[in-house]
């Protein structure tokens, strides 16, 4: 049970000072109104000094209260004298500290076991800019920032519907992070919203600094390569998902908004698909899907063929392929693993360094090291070509980079040990695993499994807006269809 606020200003001040342990940024200002002592509690750097001075300290010094009773005086301050766009009443110490650390000024009077919270936030935030990871050719250039207030406003500006609901939770035992749930109450399934809300409340974490901290609690855990949740840094993308019955999860301090549930096929869709011509959209989507299978299977297939099935190599390429393998000290599997580990090492180093140095390291390191190992005869040219083609294909679907990287290594091992038969078996296991995954009751592979023919108009290709706009798609239909199939089987 949360501890209630004391009515004594002396006890309140002692409790605050004890809880903050003499923090240098703690501000405690005492004042007196009609013989009643008061206390203002805030943190330097989190509140706007101008707003605190103009709307709190100066008005309190000029006030001539008609009543000396603490309860009536507190109500007078709350309703007629102290104003803020974000004003609330706090009754527990937990909420008192949480509000103060979120940029609120807290006002308390002796004899009143409540505090008035005034939203005078003044901390610095990053301005709205274009997302770095989700570039588009047409449409908005706005991206989410680290402020939940700004992010909510960008969504509200695009979805001018009274059904757009925003709920606030405070998660993290130490961080008490402001987490917001966004959904359309007339579109999202109530059981989906309740499931997300419950899973977030059950998330027992000391810190919540990004939406990635919460993904494992809503989607699949670490044991699964694929997650049933997605992320976006674009408000227009989030609005499109909310209109399909999804739930958005915003974490204060992070520009990455989580979307749940998220289907596997959506990784191959972008916002530009809906602004381009349908025939070009179909071409690009099929290209992304081909790139996914290419980056996962091509290295393992090459290793399996040159190791166990050289008869499948075209006759004109046979001398080059087998000659490169026999001329190098490593096996085909060893070559592939060594080169991919080197590639991941260069990529990781380039990501962690400043942009100018990171780009130079990636380009120069790749060229110099690649040329050196080929000249030294450590690897063959065919393997270099396979690695380059695979790496480029991986960037066509950036949201799947993590599972793709692990799957690529797994298929290299399978191809190098079991050959093509092992590759086929491994691919079947991958498909079965994908079809068995669910998030919030929605199959990850919907609308392919379970099969929903009417959604094909926006799956591998996109129909024109004349047809696409005739019926709204709702992600809960996949769950309802699967339930119907299960009921039929039980019957």
Region roles according to the model:
Residues 1-297, 301, 315, 435-491:
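Membrane-embedded alpha-helical signal segments
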Residues 301, 311-491:
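Generic detector of multi-pass transmembrane helix bundles and their immediately adjacent loops
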């Amino acid at each position: 049970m949360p501890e209630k606020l004391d009515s004594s200003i002396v006890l309140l001040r002692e409790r605050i000072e004890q809880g903050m342990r003499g923090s240098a940024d703690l501000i405690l200002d005492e004042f007196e109104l009609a013989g009643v002592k008061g206390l203002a509690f805030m943190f330097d750097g989190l509140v706007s000094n101008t707003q605190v001075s103009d709307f709190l300290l100066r008005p309190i010094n000029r006030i001539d209260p008609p009543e000396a009773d603490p309860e009536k005086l507190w109500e007078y301050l709350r309703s007629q004298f102290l104003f803020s766009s974000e004003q609330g009443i706090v009754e527990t110490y937990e909420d008192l500290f949480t509000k103060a650390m979120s940029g609120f000024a807290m006002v308390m009077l002796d004899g009143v076991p409540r505090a008035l919270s005034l939203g005078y936030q003044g901390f610095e935030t990053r301005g709205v800019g274009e997302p770095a990871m989700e570039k588009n050719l047409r449409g908005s250039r706005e991206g989410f920032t680290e402020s939940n207030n700004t992010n909510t406003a960008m969504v509200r500006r695009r979805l001018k519907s009274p059904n757009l609901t925003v709920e606030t939770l405070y998660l993290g035992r130490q961080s008490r992070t402001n987490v917001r749930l966004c959904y359309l109450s007339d579109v999202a399934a109530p059981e989906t919203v309740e499931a997300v809300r419950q899973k977030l409340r059950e998330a027992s974490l000391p810190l919540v600094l990004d939406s990635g901290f919460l993904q494992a609690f809503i989607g699949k855990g670490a044991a699964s390569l694929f997650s049933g949740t997605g992320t976006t840094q674009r408000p227009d993308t989030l609005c499109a998902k909310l209109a399909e019955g999804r739930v958005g999860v915003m974490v204060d301090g992070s520009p990455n908004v989580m979307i749940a549930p998220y289907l596997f096929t959506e990784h191959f869709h972008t916002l530009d698909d809906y602004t381009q011509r349908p025939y070009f959209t179909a071409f690009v989507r099929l290209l992304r899907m081909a790139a996914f299978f290419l980056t996962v299977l091509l290295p393992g297939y090459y290793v399996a063929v040159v190791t166990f099935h050289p008869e499948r190599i075209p006759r004109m390429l046979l001398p080059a392929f087998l000659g490169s393998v026999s001329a190098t000290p490593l096996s085909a599997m060893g070559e592939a693993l060594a080169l991919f580990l080197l590639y991941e090492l260069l990529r990781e180093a380039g990501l962690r360094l400043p942009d100018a140095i990171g780009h130079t390291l990636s380009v120069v390191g790749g060229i110099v090291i690649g040329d050196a190992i080929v000249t030294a005869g450590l690897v063959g040219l065919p393997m270099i070509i396979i690695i380059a083609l695979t790496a480029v294909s991986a960037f066509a679907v950036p949201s799947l980079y993590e599972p793709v990287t692990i799957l690529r290594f797994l298929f290299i091992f399978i191809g190098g040990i079991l050959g093509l038969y092992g590759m086929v078996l491994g691919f079947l296991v991958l498909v079965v695993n994908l079809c068995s995954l669910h998030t919030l009751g929605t199959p990850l592979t919907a609308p392919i499994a379970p099969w929903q023919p009417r959604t094909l108009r926006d799956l591998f290709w996109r129909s024109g807006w004349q047809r696409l706009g005739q019926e709204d798609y709702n992600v809960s239909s996949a769950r309802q269809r699967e339930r119907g199939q299960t009921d039929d089987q039980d019957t």
